[in-house]
């Protein structure tokens, strides 16, 4: 059990640091587009979870520590629904209703499409 906990922890640290770095970089370059960082990591995370899920389906021998470290740890740290929700509320509170609705729709449907695309890539 300890190796599994360590794998998830290490993946979580790596994913969280990547999300933090992405947010800092986007906010430094496009401060008025704060929501872009969350959108980017969520879409990329959805693509990656599709790819990993597809790979793990055809490679059942991949150890649970690797699977959990990447999916639960890394992608769990990288992606975030709570930040998406806060970004949407901030846009609504600033009166940018159309942008908030577009952002929410793109996040949900873009995430679903990216997950499907990632899974499909593993079937080529």
Swiss-Prot record:
Keyword hit for Phosphoprotein: no
Residues annotated for Na(+) binding in this entry: 76, 79
TM stretches of this protein: 1-21, 38-58, 69-89, 97-117
Cellular compartments per GO CC: plasma membrane
Domain of life: Bacteria
Molecular function in Gene Ontology: fluoride channel activity; metal ion binding
Subcellular compartments: Cell inner membrane
Signal peptide segment: none
Reactions it catalyzes: fluoride(in) = fluoride(out)
Family matches, as Pfam families: CRCB
Any one of the GO BP annotations: cellular detoxification of fluoride
Membrane disposition: Multi-pass membrane protein
Keywords: Cell inner membrane, Cell membrane, Ion channel, Ion transport, Membrane, Metal-binding, Sodium, Transmembrane, Transmembrane helix, Transport
Regulation: Na(+) is not transported, but it plays an essential structural role and its presence is essential for fluoride channel function.
Coiled-coil region list: none
Keyword presence, Transmembrane: yes
HAMAP family: FluC
Purpose of the protein: Fluoride-specific ion channel. Important for reducing fluoride concentration in the cell, thus reducing its toxicity.
Family membership noted in the UniProt record: Belongs to the fluoride channel Fluc/FEX (TC 1.A.43) family.
Protein name in UniProt: Fluoride-specific ion channel FluC
């Amino acid at each position: 059990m300890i190796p599994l906990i360590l794998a998830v922890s290490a993946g979580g640290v790596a994913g969280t640091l990547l999300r933090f770095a992405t947010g800092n970089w986007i906010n430094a370059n496009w401060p008025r587009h704060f929501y872009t960082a969350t959108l980017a990591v969520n879409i990329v995370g959805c693509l990656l979870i599709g790819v990993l899920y597809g790979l793990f389906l055809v490679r059942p021998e991949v150890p649970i520590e690797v699977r959990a470290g990447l999916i639960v740890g890394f992608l769990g740290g990288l992606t975030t629904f709570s930040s998406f929700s806060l970004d949407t509320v901030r846009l609504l509170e600033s009166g940018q209703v159309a942008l908030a609705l577009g952002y929410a729709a793109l996040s949900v449907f873009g995430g679903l499409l990216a997950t499907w695309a990632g899974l499909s890539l593993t079937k080529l």
